[in-house]
């Protein structure tokens, strides 16, 4: 993800492996219909209680772009992303339309596979209750 928290989290591993961090915009956090942070938090809290099919087309398009990015990975990789994006990927992999499947903790590792042109979940990351902002 191009967002600061994901890039900062990726840096120690990139330094250890002596490689560059590639930025993939499609795995950034879900865009919200407002730039106001308080309104975004309220929108996201409401949205997280529902399903993808209840959201505006822009959110569904974002989710499909994220899935397409994951399916396009040609080899094993590590992707540093965010709560909603991880849930979107897990939901797509398990055919679950809920926005919130689980609550991945900060820096937890969720493992997906994109073999045979479809996503599947190999392991969910450690969970923790997270404040949505």
Positions of PLM-derived features:
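Phosphate-coordination/substrate-recognition cap region in phosphate-metabolizing enzymes
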Residues: 1-52
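Short beta->alpha connector loops
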Residues: 4-5, 93-95
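Active-site signature of alpha/beta-hydrolase-fold catalytic machinery across serine-
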Residues: 12, 88, 92
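A polyampholytic, Gly/Pro-enriched intrinsically disordered region
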Residues: 40-54, 118-131
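Internal catalytic-core helix/loop-beta-alpha segment
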Residues: 47-74
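Generic beta-sheet signal
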Residues: 75-84
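Short Gly/Pro-enriched loop/turn and capping motifs at secondary-structure junctions
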Residues: 84-86, 95
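Domain-level recognition of soluble alpha/beta enzyme cores
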Residues: 96-120
């Amino acid at each position: 993800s191009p967002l600061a928290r994901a890039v900062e989290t990726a840096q120690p591993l990139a330094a250890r492996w002596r490689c560059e961090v590639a930025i993939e915009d499609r795995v950034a956090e879900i865009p919200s219909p407002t730039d106001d942070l308080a309104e975004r938090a309220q929108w996201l809290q409401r949205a997280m209680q529902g399903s993808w099919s209840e959201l505006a087309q822009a959110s569904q398009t974002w989710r499909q772009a994220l899935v397409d990015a994951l399916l396009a990975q040609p080899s094993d990789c590590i992707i540093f992303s965010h709560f909603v994006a991880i849930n979107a990927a897990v939901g797509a992999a398990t055919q679950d339309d809920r926005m919130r499947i689980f609550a991945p903790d900060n820096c937890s590792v969720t493992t997906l596979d994109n073999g045979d042109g479809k996503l599947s979940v190999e392991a969910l990351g450690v969970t923790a209750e997270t404040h949505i902002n």
